[in-house]
């Protein structure tokens, strides 16, 4: 799965 940082950038949900 994607790292939390990448997930943040793509889905804009931190």
Swiss-Prot record:
Primary subcellular site in the record, as a coarse category: secreted
Tissues where this protein is expressed: Expressed by the skin dorsal glands.
Gene Ontology terms describing biological process: antibiotic metabolic process; defense response to Gram-negative bacterium; defense response to Gram-positive bacterium
Keyword line: Amphibian defense peptide, Antibiotic, Antimicrobial, Disulfide bond, Secreted
Record's subcellular location: Secreted
Cysteines joined through disulfide linkages: 8-14
Gene Ontology annotations for the cellular component aspect, listed alphabetically: extracellular region
Keyword Secreted annotated: yes
Job of this protein: Antibacterial activity against the Gram-negative bacterium E.coli and the Gram-positive bacterium S.aureus.
Official protein name in the record: Japonicin-1
Organism: Rana japonica (Japanese reddish frog)
Biological classification of the source: Eukaryota, Metazoa, Chordata, Craniata, Vertebrata
